[in-house]
Amino acid sequence: MYLFMVVILFYTLVIFYVAGVNGFHIFLQMSVWRPSEATVYLPPVPVSKVVSTDEYVSRTSIYYYAGSSRLLAVGHPYFSIPNPSNTKKVLVPKVSGLQYRVFRVRLPDPNKFGFPDTSFYNPDTQRLVWACVGIEIGRGQPLGVGISGHPLLNKFDDTETNNKYPSQPGTDNRECLSMDAKQTQLCIIGCKPPTGEHWGKGTPCSGNSNGPGACPPLELMNTVIEDGDMIDTGFGCMDFKSLQANKSDVPLDICTSICKYPDYLGMASEAYGDSLFFFLRREQMFVRHLFNRAGKLGEDVPTDLYFKGSANTSALQTSAFFPTPSGSMVSSESQLFNKPYWLQRAQGHNNGICWGNQIFVTVVDTTRSTNMTLCSEEKSEATYKNENFKEYLRHVEEYDLQFIFQLCKISLTANVMQYIHTMNPDILEDWQFGLTPPPSGNLQDTYRFVTSQAITCQKTSPPTAKEDPLKKYSFWEINLKEKFSADLDQFPLGRKFLLQAGFTAKPKLKRSSPSSSSSSSAKRKKVKR
């Protein structure tokens, strides 16, 4: 074969030579194979796909109403008051309109529910779950603006309308100042507690300066939002206890607290969408006054940013400016509460399924944050004296939660059970699915006299109860296990749901049959006619 190709090439060159063609040049221009320089992208490694709950959850036409009682909270708006004899015991809790209210609503197990007709599902191959399809958060008490402040606030001078250059700050220039906070209305619904974010004190590298007076490094931290945590009031979401050592830069209610802001980005990107079915949010704020801080400035203003002054402007004032926030007017026209909301499609993969028979409702409402002033007389005299009266502050809150739940069923196929086990193995454990241990081949010991002191104790240890994974967090527990009702038309939210869904309530009363006297009189009239 090789000899044949050589002969062909020889005769080709001879022909080109006779024809007067440069055959060597044509030979060099022949196509030659070269490796491709283009980058080849291989497909990614296949991973398990997260699907919506609608893929494996079948909804029924059975709906239930559940509602809480009137929920009330009373306390001091700025701080909790401990017992003088026992500081670990709180006499008056801290209840502020600038706090999160996180309700952990407990639902009954539908698999242990007494249904009039159980033919709609097979308990051997299916399990029942609740789906939240409607909610209404009721808020009592009048609209009002709550005031917060500090009797020793680090406020040096007014930087908005100052007509002369201020003098240098003295040893202590703190003043008594109050203000209102940013206006916030918020509602978060999910079957897991919401996640918050705040800026805390980070860990500096070994080579960085971390001596006394150095600026601490910042780190964005994510934590669970608990009941009673403070919201962002207009001074940022941060750990004020760790990042403000003077305890005078912000009002009393947050100077030693952590202000958290919901991590909407993190909860929206959650794989299974359990923390955030949907949320309602309304925020507004404007700046009322402009001040600056007293104290030694840790970072000087660069000299290339200004020309040096003379006389009273030779020494620069502090450039640590700060505003006082204000939420402006509150109005009933911009309320998010006291109205129903229907969940048709959640923003995540969990379309309202209440895993673990629980649902979390997180509420913030600063439009009802009035702080009431109470006064008691300590000494009675004919003339008015300040020392004869004691002043107290209290804040009250009133809530009412109503739900519409839809009964759903899940077919326990191998793929579905594997998927649920990957998502949350506690769900299968609550459904009493588990691995059965193989029979033991060891010989067991059995004593005759089990109460004898001559042998080891034969008392079996009681089974340990399942530990609550959220027991270290603080929530407002709401038990609705005995407050479900199928008579939707007997409750306000139930009637709204029937109207919204186009259902009609079944009549409960039957028409009474005509009496014998009326029938006989009708017959007599017919005969006369």
Curated annotation (Swiss-Prot):
Location in or out of the cell: Virion; Host nucleus
InterPro entries membership: Capsid_L1_Papillomavir (IPR002210), Capsid_L1_sf_Papillomavir (IPR036973), dsDNA_vir_gr_I_capsid (IPR011222)
Protein name: Major capsid protein L1
Family statement drawn from the similarity comment of this UniProt entry: Belongs to the papillomaviridae L1 protein family.
Primary location: virion
Keyword Acetylation: no
Top-rank lineage group of the source organism: Viruses
Subunit structure: Self-assembles into homopentamers. The capsid has an icosahedral symmetry and consists of 72 capsomers, with each capsomer being a pentamer of L1. Interacts with the minor capsid protein L2; this interaction is necessary for viral genome encapsidation. Interacts with protein E2; this interaction enhances E2-dependent replication and transcription activation.
Role description: Forms an icosahedral capsid with a T=7 symmetry and a 50 nm diameter. The capsid is composed of 72 pentamers linked to each other by disulfide bonds and associated with L2 proteins. Binds to heparan sulfate proteoglycans on cell surface of basal layer keratinocytes to provide initial virion attachment. This binding mediates a conformational change in the virus capsid that facilitates efficient infection. The virion enters the host cell via endocytosis. During virus trafficking, L1 protein dissociates from the viral DNA and the genomic DNA is released to the host nucleus.
Bias (Low complexity): 512-521
Region (Disordered): 506-529
An example Gene Ontology biological process: endocytosis involved in viral entry into host cell
UniProt cross-references to Pfam families, sorted A to Z: Late_protein_L1
Keywords: Capsid protein, Disulfide bond, Host nucleus, Host-virus interaction, Late protein, T=7 icosahedral capsid protein, Viral attachment to host cell, Viral penetration into host cytoplasm, Virion, Virus endocytosis by host, Virus entry into host cell
A GO cellular-component term linked to this record: T=7 icosahedral viral capsid
GO molecular function: structural molecule activity
